[in-house]
Swiss-Prot record:
Disulfide bonds: none annotated. Its main location: membrane. Belongs to the ABC transporter superfamily. Heme (hemin) importer (TC 3.A.1.14.5) family. One of its GO terms (cellular component) is plasma membrane. InterPro entries: AAA+_ATPase, ABC_transporter-like_ATP-bd, P-loop_NTPase. SUPFAM superfamilies: P-loop containing nucleoside triphosphate hydrolases. This is Hemin import ATP-binding protein HmuV. The gene is hmuV. GO terms for molecular function: ATP binding; ATP hydrolysis activity.
Amino acid sequence: MQTIAIQGRDLCVTYGSRQVLDHVDITLRCGEVAALLGPNGAGKSTLLKLLCGEMSGAGKLDYFGVPASQWPAEKLANHLGILPQQSSLTFPFTAQEVVELGAIPLNLPRKEVERVARHYMLKTDVLHLAASLYPSLSGGEKQRLHLARVLTQLHQAGQQRILMLDEPTSALDLAHQHNTLQLARQLADEEQCAVVVVLHDLNLAAQYSDRLILLHQGKIVCDAAPWQALTAERIEQVYGYQALVAAHPTRDFPMVYPA
C-alpha cells in the first residue's frame, strides 16, 4: 500500500466573512500525482498554501503520519518543496547560484552542491543557462529554474518527498509544459514522490495525474481518477461550461472539448 504523505482533515480557511476552504478532507500518497482543479476562486491555491504550511487555518494536518505542528521547519524543508506561482522577486545571482539556494537545508560539501544543482538543471532543461544572470531570463526559464531549485532542496529525502506545484505550466511553451509534467510523473513513478499540482488545463491534468481533485466554492466536489472525474455533467457543475468528453485517439485518458 502507498504511504500516506499528507492527510488533512476538516481544513478551513476564512477571509473575513468569506469561507475560502470549507471543511476539506484530503489525502495525498507517495507515488501518485494529484491535480487540484477548479475555476478561479475555487480555493486551489489556498489549499496548496495550507498544505505546505505557508498559510494557517483550522483543521488537522499530518505529514507522513506526524502532526504538522511537530515538524521543525528545517526538517520539513528537507521533505516538502513548493514551486509557487511566478513572483516579481529577483536575485542578483547567476542561474546556477539560484538553484544552489535549494541546497541550503542539506549541509552538503561545495562540490556536491554544484553536482546536485547541475543534475536538476539538466532535468529541467536550464543547464545551458547556468552562467546567465537571473534577471535576464524569461518567465518560463525562471519557472524551470525554480523547479530545479525545489528538486535540489528535496535531494536527500529519499522516498519521503512531497512536491507541490502551483500552476507550473502557466508561463511555459507547449514542449516545456509537457516536459515539466512528465518530470513530475517520473518522480512519482520511479522515486515514489508525492506530487500535488494546481492546473487549469483539464487535458494536461487528465494526461499526467492519477487523481483529479475538483474544487468548487471552497469544497471538494470530486476526488477520482480522470475517467470518473471528467464527465460533461461535472464540468458543467464546476465550471458552468458545456463540454464534450471523449477518449484521446491513441492513449487511455479523457479529453475535454467545447460542446
